[in-house]
From Swiss-Prot:
Transmembrane segments: 248-256, 259-266, 377-384, 390-395
Protein name: Complement component C8 alpha chain
Organism: Homo sapiens
UniProt region (Disordered), positions on chain: 562-584
UniProt domain MACPF: residue ranges: 135-498
An annotated GO BP: complement activation
Subcellular location: Secreted; Target cell membrane
Family label: Belongs to the complement C6/C7/C8/C9 family.
Binding sites annotated in the UniProt record for Ca(2+): 113, 116, 118, 120, 126-127
């Protein structure tokens, strides 16, 4: 087979019209492509009992083997549900004694919260049939909730890096009327109907929900626009991954920048999948990349540590979990409410765009990537952190001539093949506009809209089972231990360590139930096994953790090996520990 390939390539070199890409391919050192691996799912589990509060039953199947190296993909989902009827009464929380119990979910409330004007039950039953409403001392109906409170209340899936359903109840106030002062309320507004200027008194104070211990508005300020330059897509991906890991304080399942990238696993695809697919189009060509990035903070917050009031939907799902371990039911709970919950963080927004630059064309124009970056970023009207100045072959006048790269024709004239934008936070109108129109007005308008439409941009978090320690629901230790055990199993089932090996410093990526290797420039093939550079250093990558050993003397351990693949030609060994222990 190899002789035939070599003969064909030899004939091609003697023919006219051979492309540059074909010449590159001729210099590629061929290696055996690993055999394709077909995706395998387990058989469906038995249906769960009918959930009486939902009138639904569930079943699941496990990912036995993700497909690799072009193998057949799996079809269908790993979760299934069906309607059902249960003869069992809807499960309630333990009896509330002298306290009030919400009709639908069984939440317990202190009597002073009944008929106080606040709806503390999701079904409003605490405010039904009230002859005398004991209103809170101060009229709180005039205050809007603090911006972003619903976002901070959500669970978080550390594998998909996506939000899950609510863990905290962001609409519960505990009978209190605590407000947060907004220092920028004095900003003048214009009422076009009445043709008058006025102060935004309605935005002077915001009401703080019970589960928020602290919330402090920040004067609108960005971190400055930074620019970074990359010679290949892999280095850029590693940096983006590291930034995402740095945004949260617990990194279970993520690992250092050199470990496998986790994207879109379980039942959904990460929002980053489209970004990776766009970037992957430029991986095998001679492109370089400039990443322009800014982060805007609008507020800091800290959540309550003890006596947490859970969202009523989560409370109901929690009460329906059996005390006996059932991975399917507990994994479904994790899939719905996240692997982790947020304990503190910052609100605001993030804006970044990546310039894909044709290196050969840029050099023929006599300009640099810094010149191009300055020309594009200057349209935002913000200073760069590294004080880039327009220079080289691209003068300020030349930049203006092409309109700052605002049209496709102008971009092509400055060697910019594509622009990949990502915007988080802000009103939908301004964030969408910023992705398409990089102007000073659009950027500043987006920044102002972040004050009242922020997302969580930096945060600390804890594993989801820890929240059960900090509620007032009573003894839940059996469920907490089951949830902890299921979380370990869930994180291993959907980990990119199951992909690979990806050779020549390729990066394994797990998308849904499919694995692929992101190859560096100069490498290609399903496993990046073909390379143009003979004897180049290739770093090692970890295998998955083994199962936990039997408990001995209160300690158990698990291991992993640096063989997925092993280092080659003097490449670096895997970072981190080979053995992990825990109390048992």
């Amino acid at each position: 087979m190899f002789a035939v390939v070599f003969f064909i390539l030899s004939l091609m070199t003697c023919q006219p019209g051979v492309t540059a890409q074909e010449k590159v391919n001729q210099r590629v050192r061929r290696a055996a492509t690993p055999a394709a691996v077909t995706c395998q799912l387990s058989n469906w589990s038995e249906w769960t009992d009918c959930f009486p509060c939902q009138d639904k039953k569930y079943r699941h199947r496990s990912l036995l083997q993700p497909n690799k190296f072009g193998g057949t993909i799996c079809s269908g989902d790993i979760w299934d549900q069906a309607s059902c009827s249960s003869s069992t009464t809807c499960v309630r929380q333990a009896q509330c004694g002298q306290d009030f119990q919400c009709k639908e979910t069984g939440r317990c409330l202190k009597r002073h919260l009944v008929c106080n004007g606040d709806q503390d039950c999701l079904d409003g039953s605490d405010e039904d049939d009230c002859e005398d409403v004991r209103a809170i001392d101060e009229d709180c109906s005039q205050y809007e909730p603090i911006p972003g409170s619903q976002k901070a209340a959500l669970g978080y899936n550390i594998l998909t890096q996506e939000d899950a359903q609510s863990v905290y109840d962001a609409s519960y106030y505990g009978g209190q009327c605590e407000t947060v002062y907004n220092g920028e309320w004095r900003e003048l507004r214009y009422d076009s109907t009445c043709e008058r200027l006025y102060y935004g008194d309605d935005e002077k104070y915001f009401r703080k929900p019970y589960n928020f211990l602290k919330y402090h508005f920040e004067a609108l300020a960005d971190t400055g626009i930074s620019s970074e330059f990359y010679d290949n897509a892999n280095d850029l991906l590693s940096k983006v991954k590291k930034d995402k890991s740095d945004s949260f304080g617990v990194t279970i399942g993520i690992g250092p920048a050199g470990s496998p990238l986790l994207v879109g696993v379980g039942v959904s695809h990460s929002q980053d999948t489209s970004f990776l697919n766009e970037l992957n189009k430029y991986n095998e060509k001679k492109f370089i990349f400039t990443r322009i990035f800014t982060k805007v903070q609008t507020a800091h917050f800290k959540m309550r540590k003890d006596d947490i009031m859970l969202d009523e939907g989560m409370l109901q799902s929690l009460m329906e979990l059996p005390d006996q371990y059932n991975y399917g039911m507990y994994a479904k709970f994790i899939n719905d409410y996240g692997t982790h919950y947020i304990t503190s963080g910052s609100m605001g927004g993030i804006y970044e765009y990546i310039l894909v630059i044709d290196k050969a064309k840029m050099e023929s124009l006599g300009i640099t990537s810094r010149d191009i970056t300055t020309c594009f970023g200057g349209s935002l009207g913000i200073q760069y952190e590294d004080k880039i100045n327009v220079g080289g072959g691209l003068s300020g006048d030349h930049c203006k001539k092409f309109g700052g790269g605002k049209t496709e024709r102008a971009r092509k004239a400055m060697a910019v093949e594509d622009i990949i934008s990502r915007v988080r936070g802000g009103s939908s109108g301004w964030s969408g506009g910023l992705a398409q129109n990089r102007s000073t007005i659009t950027y500043r308008s987006w920044g102002r809209s972040l004050k009242y439409n922020p997302v969580v941009i930096d945060f600390e978090m804890q594993p989801i089972h820890e929240v059960l320690r900090h509620t007032s629901l009573g003894p839940l230790e059996a469920k907490r231990q089951n949830l902890r055990r299921a979380l370990d199993q869930y994180l291993m089932e959907f980990n990119a360590c199951r992909c690979g090996p990806c050779f020549n410093n390729g990066v394994p990526i797990l998308e849904g139930t499919s694995c692929r290797c992101q190859c560096r420039l100069g490498s290609l093939g399903a496993a990046c096994e073909q390379t143009q550079t003979e004897g180049a250093k290739a770093d090692g990558s970890w295998s998955c953790w083994s199962s936990w050993s039997v408990c001995r003397a209160g300690i158990q351990e698990r291991r992993r090996e640096c063989d997925n693949p092993a280092p080659q030609n003097g490449g670096a060994s895997c970072p981190g520990r080979k053995v992990q222990t825990q109390a048992c």
